[in-house]
Amino acid sequence: MARVGAPLGVLLLSGGHERAHYALVVAAGAAALGREVTLFATNAGCRLLLDPTPLLEDAREAALAERGVATITALLPAAAELGVRRIACEAGLRAEDLAGAALAPGVELAGVATFLAAVGDGQILTL
């Protein structure tokens, strides 16, 4: 699919299920519309990009599934298939004492400069 519109950067700071879930909703939605999307997780937000992510154990995950809402379980592979670039912040992993944790396949390890360069003059949404 040809990319259209300005790049979108999604900056995930929170380790909570609700914000991580919506970061994936926005990222996948924008990518489905043809936008170039970079999801950058830092600090507690890095937990979303771990393999496996502990967010799957959150009670909200089961509640969303029961209500027919796309879950993190469904959105993570969908975002990857749609071409969402996923980056875990190296400093954020260290700050959360996750430096040795396994990242999900396809997740890059980089810093904020890489994220900002990827987004360029595009939009940044912080969750």
Language model feature labels by segment:
Residues 45-58:
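N-terminal beta-loop-helix "entrance" segment that forms/cooperates
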Residues 9-21:
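Short, glycine-rich nucleotide/cofactor-binding loops
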Residues 37-43, 86-90:
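Short internal beta-strands
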Residues 87-127:
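N-terminal glycine-rich phosphate/adenylate-binding segment common to multiple enzyme folds
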Residues 21-33, 39:
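Histidine-anchored nucleotide/phosphate-binding helix
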Residues 16, 62-66, 102-105:
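Short, flexible loop segments at the rims of nucleotide/cofactor-binding pockets, characterized by
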Residues 26-30, 78, 115:
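Hydrophobic/aromatic ligand-binding patch that stacks against planar heteroaromatic rings
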Residues 57-87:
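A glycine-rich helix N-cap at a beta->alpha junction
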